[in-house]
A protein has these predicted regions:
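Local sequence-structure signature of Cys/Sec-based thiol-disulfide redox active-site neighborhoods
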Residues: 9-41
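Structural micro-motif
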Residues: 65-74
Length: 105
């Protein structure tokens, strides 16, 4: 997963990419550290574009994307958020949603 450094980069991905996953974490989040490799494995197996941000580094994204807890996984498709999971990530559900998007491309 590639790191996005600011809110403008997030907006550009939403506008430019047909679909992608955004993973949101924070530095002091132990669950985030455990979940990130699992998410990376799913997106790499599906060849699905994915990016991550540290919520504490992009406060504008926290407000604009309603990021009230971490970790958060958001799937964007055709410029819209179509799926979100926060705190407890259901990896089977995430994999299923990514497969659905991949089949529709």
């Amino acid at each position: 997963m590639k790191k996005l450094e600011n809110y403008e980069q997030i907006l550009n991905k939403i506008k430019e990419e047909e679909y992608f996953l955004l993973y949101v974490s924070m530095n002091n989040c132990s669950v985030c550290l455990v979940d990130m490799p699992k998410v990376e494995k799913i997106v790499s197996e599906q060849n699905f574009p994915a990016y991550y941000i540290k919520a504490s580094e992009i406060p504008e994204a926290v407000g604009q994307l309603s990021l009230f807890s971490v970790p958060v996984v958001i799937l964007f498709y055709e410029g819209r958020e179509i799926h979100r999971q926060a705190k407890i990530i259901d990896f089977d559900e995430l994999n299923y949603r990514i497969e659905q998007i991949s089949e529709n491309k």
